[in-house]
Amino acid sequence: MKKLFLILFVLFGLNSSVFADGHVKRILSTSQTGMGNDIVYPSGKAKITAFEFTVPVGGPVVPHTHSFPVLIMIQQGEIELTQGGKSYVYKAGDAFIEDVGVAHESKNIGDVPVKAIVVAMGVEGQKIM
């Protein structure tokens, strides 16, 4: 778990004074999911997996759950996430954490494919996808 916090600190905790000629833009700093619930971490040896995810125009993401936090950073397009009868819309530039253990589904509601960077914050031996 300490490694997870170190990785998250490196990704999100740096400020622009660290880079002499660079620029750092904070994408997300939160203790809650995009649905307003507290973030819950699994116990065990941390294993972070990052990948690019694409949803075609009109395409759904079938109902599913996660047993670990998932950070989603929308790079292109617009997606509607539905969970517990409520809908949340995220567009390019938005970042959010999905709830752990709660069924949700999504749909591309824009006119271009949705491209997102997805960071799964699981543990060793846990199935990610």
Please tell me what each predicted stretch does.
Residues 60-62, 80, 96, 100-107:
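Histidine-centered metal-chelating micro-motifs
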